[in-house]
Each structure stands twice: as C-alpha cells, then as structure tokens.
C-alpha cells in the first residue's frame, strides 16, 4: 500500500492561487485507507474549498487512482465538469497525480505527500517494510528486510552502534540486524547465513523510471 499524508490546507490553497474552478480526484484504495483521498475526504475538501471561495466543478474517486484506463473512462464521463476546471486537485499518491495529468491533459495539483510503501499494523497505523529495491533477499534474512528497516541500509550486518537492542539512528526502533539474528537463530538458519557470502546489492536492477510488461501482454503487442 502506498502511504500518503495530506498536505496542510494552506499549502493546497497556495498551489491553487489564481485558479477559480477545480475538479477533485480521489482514490478508492490506498488514499481511502490512509484517510487522504477517499469519498469522505474528497467531500470534506470540496466543502473547505467552497468556503474559501473556490468553485468545485465536480469530483470522482477512481478505482484505483493509479489505473490509466480507469482514469480515462471516468474522466470521459466527467468531461464537461473537467473542462470547466482550471485544474485538478488530486487526492492520491504521486503516481495517481501523474495518471490524472496524463488522462486529462489538465494542470494537476497534488493534495498529498507520498511517503512510502507501507504495511497496515492496525487502523491508522502504517509501517515501511519494503523499499521496492528490485532484488529481494528476504529468504536470506529470515523474512526481515535490512535494506528498508536499517536506516543505514546495511546488508552485511549491524553497524555496531546499537545500544540495548535499539537502533543508533532512531532509538525508538529495535535494531533490525538483532531482529534478523534472533529470527535466523529461531528457524535454524543462522549458521547457513553466517557461512554464506556477503550479499552485494545490484542497483542496476531498479533504475528510475522503471517499466514492467507482463510476457503475455508483450507477446500480444508483438503479434499486432
């Protein structure tokens, strides 16, 4: 899940300076769970903007906000309302904001800051467990990711700065390498890990921007 945090309303207003009419775009998935762009938040944003003298020509909650085909379909339905707007205020992640721009051709303003790929611990509580590095080593580290959960991104063991099992950089967090050590010991994989070569990450496997085309779709395109 992509974790987002709503920008301060004053910042949103500043980005809309000089624009009278806006169309709102939400997301039914990640932004809904994060309470930054579901139907409830879109309606609240509409009311707040109208209180500030803005005209909201319409709104839509895409399912999801990062699907280009879905965005094009819904934008066609709202063609008139979008045409009346000076810009779109997009209440999803950065990917969704860029999809909205591509699908509409309009100026877009992000209402949220995109933070990380997160897991849901409980309602309203999210944690970053994966950095989408493109070279997963969870099978080697007991299902715990050092690349993400170590602030220094160390892949060859702890830095030596941990104190009482806590991270040197953020003492509120447990040292992930101590967690990995304990987990590998628990599942009987510690000796195997210590005897294996140090993993060297290949940063070339995940360069920006990335693209993935599923083989069946690639074959279909090649046959056209």
Model-predicted regions and their roles:
Residues 1-63, 75-88, 102-140, 144-224:
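Iron-sulfur (Fe-S) cluster-binding modules
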Residues 96-98:
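Short, well-ordered alpha-helical microsegments
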Residues 66-68:
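ATP-dependent adenylate-handling ligase core
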Residues 90-94:
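N-terminal glycine-rich "phosphate-gripper" loop used for MgATP/nucleotide binding
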């Amino acid at each position: 899940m992509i974790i987002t945090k709503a920008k301060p309303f004053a910042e949103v207003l500043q980005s809309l300076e000089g624009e009278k009419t806006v169309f709102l775009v939400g997301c039914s998935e990640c932004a809904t769970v994060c309470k930054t762009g579901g139907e409830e938040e879109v309606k609240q944003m509409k009311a707040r903007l109208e209180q500030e003298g803005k005209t909201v020509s319409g709104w839509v909650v895409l399912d999801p906000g990062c699907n280009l085909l879905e965005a094009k379909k819904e934008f066609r339905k709202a063609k008139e309302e979008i045409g009346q707007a000076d810009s779109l205020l997009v209440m999803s992640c950065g990917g969704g904001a860029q999809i909205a721009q591509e699908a509409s051709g309009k100026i877009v303003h992000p209402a949220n800051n995109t933070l990380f790929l997160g897991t849901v611990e409980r309602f309203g509580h999210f944690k970053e467990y994966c950095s989408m590095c493109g070279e997963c080593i969870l099978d080697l580290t007991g299902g715990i990711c050092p690349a993400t959960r170590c602030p220094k991104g160390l892949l060859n063991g702890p830095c030596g700065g941990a104190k009482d099992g806590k991270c040197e950089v953020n003492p509120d967090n447990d040292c992930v390498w101590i967690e990995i050590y304990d987990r590998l010991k628990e599942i009987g994989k510690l000796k195997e890990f210590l005897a294996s070569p140090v993993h060297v990450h290949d940063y070339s496997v995940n360069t920006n921007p990335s693209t993935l085309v599923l083989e069946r779709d690639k074959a279909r395109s090649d046959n056209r």
